[in-house]
């Protein structure tokens, strides 16, 4: 197994007085896609906004605006991944509590792809 070669305690101490992330990454909540590990970044290097299916609502957009407009991040990256459970659930028409509203925001993208690639 690979091990993290960073001194996390030191990074926590170094960033305790403030942060200056150069980028904000919007990614899915999928546990297999840890942003900092995927890009070999340490604590304080990037803002990470995570939401199932990479859905942007006012709160997520406000977080991204904070990262860039207030904290000075210069880059925005949207990180997708394969076999996304939220996309699969939207394709299957899953309805369950609050996830129903979230999945409804994925459906227009699914319709666009289906129109581009009819079976």
What are these regions (language model features)?
Residues 1-20, 43-44, 53-74, 85-119:
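Divalent-metal-activated hydrolytic enzyme cores
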Residues 76-82:
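Ordered, amphipathic secondary-structure segments that act as subunit-interaction surfaces
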């Amino acid at each position: 197994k690979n091990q993290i070669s960073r001194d996390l305690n030191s990074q926590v101490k170094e960033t305790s007085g403030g942060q200056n992330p150069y980028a904000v990454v919007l990614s899915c909540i999928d546990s297999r896609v840890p942003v900092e590990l995927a890009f070999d970044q340490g604590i304080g290097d990037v803002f990470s906004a995570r939401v199932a299916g990479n859905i942007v609502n006012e709160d997520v957009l406000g977080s991204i605006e904070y990262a860039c407009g207030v904290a000075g991040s210069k880059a925005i990256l949207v990180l997708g991944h394969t076999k996304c459970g939220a996309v699969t659930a939207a394709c299957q028409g899953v309805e369950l509590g609050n996830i129903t509203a979230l999945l409804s925001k994925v459906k227009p993208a699914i319709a666009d792809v289906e129109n581009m690639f009819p079976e």
